[in-house]
Amino acid sequence: MKRAILIVILLPFIATVNCFAFKSDLPTDTILSRAMSAAEKYNELVENYTAEVYVRSYVETIRKNFLYKYTHLIPDFVLHDPENEDAVIETISDLRYEYPNTYVQDIRHVTGTLTKKKDIDLIPFELLNINIYGETTNDESFFMPIRFSTAKYYRYTLYQSFTSNNKEYYNIHFVPIYENPKLLKGSFIVEKGTWRVIFFRGEGLDIFSDFSFEMTMGDEWVTNYLPVNITIYQTAAYLGNVLAGRHLASINYKEIALRQFQQPKGSLNISNSYKVRLDSVPLHSDTLFWEKIRPIPLQAREIDVIERYHQQQITRENQRKTNDSLGNNRMAQHMAQRMVVNSSYRYKSARFGYSGLLNPLMLGYSSRDGITYRQKFSFMADLKRSRNIKVNAFAGYMFRRKEFFTDLTTTFNYEPLRLGSATFSLGIGNPTYSSLFVDQIRDKLENQGISFDDISLNYYKDYYFKLFNTFEATNGLLFQTGVDYHIRKSKNNVTMLRSLTLNGDPIGQLFGTKRSFAPYIQVIWTPEQYYRFEGRQKIYARSYYPTFKVEFSRSLLDVLGSTSQYNRIELDISQKIDFGLMHSFQYHIGVGKFINQETEYFADFVYFSKNNFPENWDDGLGGNFNLLSRSLYNASDSYLQGHIMLESPFLILKNIPFISDFADKERLYLSQLHTPQIKSYSELGYGIGNRFFNAGLFAAFHKTRFEEIGVRAAFEL
């Protein structure tokens, strides 16, 4: 079917009376060089436009088995009709574009046999906004082939030269030099002289599917550099089931403004880089309306599908009046789905989210900590002037250590324009031990049978309460002030020690309930911080400069029963540096110290702590130590740490079949730690990942001595 469509599209060029093939008088390299030079100019040609977009989606089940009926339980997976072999959806939307990559698509009308929001969300609208002259797609999913910077990833062949209406054209085929989800294969036709692309076809791979898209550019001067017709094919294959989809799009431009090529005014506001807006489905079922406005006539098969759907609707309505069992079955399926997937609900101005009790994405694994399991719940109530109240609840369990963690955080976002918020948080944190305990064990009992490695981290269980306020003084500069209150309770289980003092004196006085009341101030500064707005809510995006964090805390003795008095100061610097295409380098440097310790204290740092359920950086693995023993996080009153991560789509796996098909990111890790006790601890790592999961292999070294090797995996939502 794909080949047939391609022939139909090319037919006007090869069937014209004045159309004939000829041998090109230009080398392929020259044609490519001129086309790529023109692409750099055409990429920045359009300043803005508005358009009406018609999209018709037809999906068909090619092959299925008994597992097919459970496909709808997988969220955001594949567009299909669980009750029929095929389905049709039609949409009309308004598309607005602003240079360089701001797309806002408002869906105005929807009709067809699948009209739920979850079905509309699976239509690949993002492929309609591909700029064939760009280096990458807007979401950086693919490297486009018509640029000098991406040419090193492709091989090109001049397939055909021909003339039509006294114009010469070149049909160029391209293939990737190795398999990778970031690379396409396909062809494009360029016009000699203007060197613009008149037709583009690309094919790509995903984990469970493959797809192709065809773009035909306009034939009027104002649309010569913009697509007017797009066809997208998708095929999903999983567990013996095969589903195919075809999406036809027609774009009718209303207004187009070209750029004046003047120096743009600098702005850090990058709101709405790409957004499809569909708060509720604007269902419009008037047959006469669609017959009048539909730019692409329905095919016979599509007419049959729609007529069958209308007949089924009548039958269902009759059944509903006489039997409620059908509704009960659907309710049971709905409940089962919510058990295994991340789900969200909306009621008036309130939104709820739940991770799903049996959701496999809530599982994690590391060779040191074993299997971890977590649950998340969220609630947000919208108020006037874009204000809101958010509640996030978290619970996690580590099976190997039999430890339970919780957190309940409530935030009142009272000034969204200035990131003003007040937050209250409480929960159960990492088990820990006090400085008094460590000092006495290490300094006084070292010769009596207890070594540092014998300490059990279950001596103190940490219950924390945190109240703080955050406010933006100016763009990129945030101030946070608050109070940390900890209650640390020991299990008073002295037998957990592997030995006692020689004279049998108990050391129970080292245990009990300890409290700390610590006001703190935190300053976060990012120079030239880019941001965007969603309504009145300001959201930080990126910056070309590092982010600096400074935090100072002082624990006050005898306030709310506090037994500690100390000062803590920490400095943290982090940055993500993008270079090349989809390559990045991230670093994170931190230093901290407890000073003026006048009493017993717990060496719990903010930026150097055990994260049992990591969500650092973009991969869930980097930015922390993956193999470091948790006993060493609290073993010193100071630390100096550094982490770096290099990410690229092409490192080691690019020439390995199968693996390179699904792993579109590779990462190298290096972490270094220095404390007065550890001196030098290092971790080296290598990781792979995609949008579903990330996994890494790490090796640990103490000074120059190899310690251990381990793995860690994190799943993406």
Predicted segment positions?
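Bacterial N-terminal signal peptides
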Residues: 7-16
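Exposed, low-structure sequence patches enriched in small/polar residues
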Residues: 4, 137, 141-142, 274-717
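Gly/Pro-enriched, hydrophobic low-complexity segments
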Residues: 143-145, 157-158, 167-275, 590
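Short, conserved secondary-structure transition motifs
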Residues: 55-63, 234-241, 254-264, 427-435, ...
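Short, flexible loop/turn elements at secondary-structure junctions
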Residues: 2-3, 55, 160, 174-178, ...
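Flexible, membrane-facing loop/turn or short amphipathic-helix motifs
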Residues: 60-66, 202-206, 238-242, 362-365, ...
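Aromatic/His-enriched, Gly/Pro-containing loop or helix-boundary segments
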Residues: 22, 203, 215-218, 447-456
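Structured extracytoplasmic
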Residues: 21-169, 177-183, 247-365, 456, ...
